[in-house]
Amino acid sequence: PNPRVVIMVRDLRAIYSSMEKKFRQNPDIDPKIMNNMDMTGITTDQRVGIWSQTHPTGYTVIKLQEMILQKLDKSVLFFRYEDFCQAPDEHMKRLYEFFQVEYFQHDWNNIQQMTSENDEAHGIFGDHKIRTKLEQTPDDFKEVLGVQTCNRIVNENRWFYDYFRYN
């Protein structure tokens, strides 16, 4: 078999920042991460540590690293979210070539929601609403997570930042 796999990656700091913002936006919903008695998950840094070791993010990052270690990445087309937002047509042309299908010009200012998800199944992190216009969200991870937590994320995932050429 010769499977063709496409994986979009994103700066892990931005992913954890997004999760932290969802956590803060929903103080009335218990995502089972914070335990005041045990004093776990009560700080941003602790929550990032928990997310980095559990589903969905931690598991995915660990499996991605294992795939690369086993050299299974040779048949994968990787896109960085940040690059895709800057040059979507260029990336889509590569995608169409990868799948050996005829290119279709997309309208990045009129994106339609064609799928539906049961967001309630994902708790506070379930947000599968597609924006109608392709725009990169601002990099606010230093403000949301703090510099120390951002540095820890990079240090603990150096392979990720090197492999995908994040600075």
Region locations from a protein language model:
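PAPS-dependent sulfotransferase catalytic domain
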Residues: 13-98
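Active-site periphery "cap/insert" segments of enzyme catalytic domains
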Residues: 1
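Extended cationic-aromatic binding surfaces that line active-site or macromolecule-binding grooves
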Residues: 10
